[in-house]
């Protein structure tokens, strides 16, 4: 290595490392010219074992050989966490915005709950007020009137259950603007209830109407109107969006990961929330370590030329021509960076395949061991282990292979030792195979699979040129931003298809074999 390192007493050399060193020397001779003079002096301290097995700080797997890090931990002098005045200002702003969102959320819930309670109690009040105010003057309620009581009771129960299922659900997100259809429905219910109360106050309370059956029928009509409003709410809020009308493409700005979705008529803010719901289980987890090119490519310096004129003034034209020729020749030189990138990628793939094979073999052997222990436990009940103890017993045999594989694939920040133990315990408890255990680690999984501290974004920012309460249209583009990356969403309308019918008579499928002298039958 080019770095000045101090090796601990736990490091050792093996025959495999010598063969690996020969392979690495051949590769270094091929690219020695491009790498000379481009490396800076770095100081790396190798500490004795004593740190956690899966250290999140040691992610420099690309610069190590196959036996590096078996008993050591690399600690660099570079700080990965810093905070500035701008960060503090942004955090304060986020806290203020979250407080405003909480207030608006509670205000909307209070208004909706009050309106629902008013509309539910109004029919009951219509029937109770005459009994309380002028009970002696009311006409007797016959059989038909008593049957209306049953109708009102069941309709109110249906309305209560339907409203609870449709409106009183836990919100999935805080919207930056009011949900237009929900607000229109609330206004419609408010106007309906107020209109019924005005008519009830003028025509029934003031005149003290004695026809109690007519009053009950009036209350039944209000319940029927509320049921129709609830049906309208189901159509506008749930059924309208089911028919696909648009195709949206979601692209992550950093690594280019993309997905396509079909979606119906929704406002831009509701589409944004729907996309975020699908993002966490459709997109692979964002890993910024995979975005960097190899250091040999990034540190390569382009050669430059400086041309000085040392002659007289009359030689200025000649020197200018020579300098142009030199610069043109330098520009025609082919850059070998793609060769460097090719060899780096090939070496990385080779290392990943080798360490993957080691990990698979280690896990297979560990699971075979735990199955053998389970068979022995049936004979010796005194030595029975619970899943946690069994996971801890076999984890040591696969820990080194797991650590080196996660370092090579740059997945180490997303898998702690405790999370691996918990997953191993889960697999043992449910009698899962080694392949089922390795499924989480052999490739990047969806974002929701990892611990929320790794991916949780408290707030996303919706950036759109169109008002977010408008519905989707063809060509609409908006962005969902967070601190480290953003999701760019573009919209295309699903085209209209015109199909024509062409009838084919089954009797027309007749063929004739053409025989020639060379034809073999």
Curated annotation (Swiss-Prot):
Residues 130-147, 200-218 are extracellular. It is found in: Cell membrane. It is a multi-pass membrane protein. A motif (PDZ-binding) lies at residues 518-521. The chain crosses the membrane at residues 109-129, 148-168, 179-199, 219-239. The keyword Nucleotide-binding does not apply. Residues 1-108, 169-178, 240-521 are cytoplasmic. Residues 1-81 are annotated as: Disordered. Residues 57-67 have a biased composition (Basic and acidic residues). GO terms for cellular component: plasma membrane. Residues 69-81 have a biased composition (Low complexity). The keyword Protein biosynthesis does not apply. Has a role in non-canonical Wnt/planar cell polarity (PCP) signaling; can recruit dvl/dsh and prickle from the cytoplasm to the plasma membrane. Acts in a PCP complex to regulate the polarized assembly of fibronectrin on the surface of the mesoderm during gastrulation. Regulates convergent extension in both dorsal mesoderm and neural tissue without affecting cell fate. Regulates neural fold closure during neurulation. May be required for cell surface localization of fzd3 and fzd6 in the inner ear. Interacts with dvl/dsh. Interacts with prickle3. This is Vang-like protein 2. It comes from Xenopus tropicalis. The lineage of its organism: Eukaryota, Metazoa, Chordata, Craniata, Vertebrata.
């Amino acid at each position: 290595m080019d770095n000045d390192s101090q090796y601990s007493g736990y490091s050792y050399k093996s025959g495999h490392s010598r063969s690996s060193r020969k392979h690495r020397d051949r590769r270094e001779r091929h690219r020695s010219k491009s790498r000379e003079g481009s490396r800076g002096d770095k100081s790396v301290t190798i500490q004795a074992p004593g740190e956690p097995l899966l250290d999140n700080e040691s992610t420099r797997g690309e610069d190590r050989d196959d036996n590096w890090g078996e008993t050591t931990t690399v600690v660099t002098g570079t700080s990965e966490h810093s905070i500035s005045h701008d960060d503090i200002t942004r955090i304060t702003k986020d806290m203020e915005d979250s407080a405003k969102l909480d207030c608006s959320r509670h205000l909307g819930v209070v208004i909706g709950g009050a309106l629902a309670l008013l509309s539910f109690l109004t029919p009951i009040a219509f029937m109770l007020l005459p009994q309380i105010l002028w009970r002696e003057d009311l006409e007797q309620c016959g059989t038909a009137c008593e049957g209306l009581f049953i109708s009102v009771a069941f309709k109110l129960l249906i309305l209560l259950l339907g409203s609870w299922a449709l409106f009183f659900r836990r919100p999935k997100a805080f919207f930056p603007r009011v949900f237009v259809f929900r607000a229109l429905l609330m206004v419609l219910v408010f106007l309906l209830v107020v209109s019924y109360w005005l008519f009830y106050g003028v025509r029934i309370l003031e005149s003290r109407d004695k026809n109690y059956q007519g009053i009950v029928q009036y209350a039944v009509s209000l319940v029927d109107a509320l049921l129709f409003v609830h049906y309208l709410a189901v159509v506008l809020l749930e059924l309208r969006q089911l028919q696909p009308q648009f195709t949206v493409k979601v692209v992550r700005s950093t690594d280019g990961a993309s997905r396509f979705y079909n979606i119906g008529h929704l406002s831009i803010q509701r589409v944004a929330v729907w996309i975020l719901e699908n993002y966490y289980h459709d997109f692979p987890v964002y890993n910024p370590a995979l975005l960097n090119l190899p250091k040999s490519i990034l540190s390569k310096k382009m050669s430059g030329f400086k041309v000085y004129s040392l002659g007289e003034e009359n030689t200025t034209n000649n020197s200018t021509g020579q300098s142009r020729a030199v610069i043109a020749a330098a520009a025609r030189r082919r850059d070998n960076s793609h060769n460097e990138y090719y060899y780096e990628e090939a070496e990385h793939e080779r290392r990943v395949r080798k360490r993957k094979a080691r990990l698979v073999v280690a896990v297979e052997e560990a699971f075979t061991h735990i199955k053998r222990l389970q068979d022995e436990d049936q004979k010796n009940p005194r030595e029975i282990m619970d899943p946690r103890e069994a996971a801890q017993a076999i984890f040591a045999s696969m820990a080194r292979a797991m650590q080196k594989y996660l370092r090579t694939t740059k997945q180490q920040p997303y898998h702690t030792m405790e999370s691996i133990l918990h997953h191993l315990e889960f697999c043992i408890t449910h009698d899962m195979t080694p392949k089922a255990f390795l499924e989480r680690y052999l490739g990047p999984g969806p974002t929701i699979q990892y611990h929320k501290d790794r991916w949780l974004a408290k707030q996303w920012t919706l950036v759109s040129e169109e008002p977010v309460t408008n519905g989707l249209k063809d060509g609409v583009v908006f962005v969902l931003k967070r601190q480290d990356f953003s999701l760019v969403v573009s919209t295309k309308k699903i085209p209209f298809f015109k199909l024509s019918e062409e009838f084919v008579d089954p009797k027309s499928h007749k063929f004739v074999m053409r025989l020639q002298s060379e034809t073999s039958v």
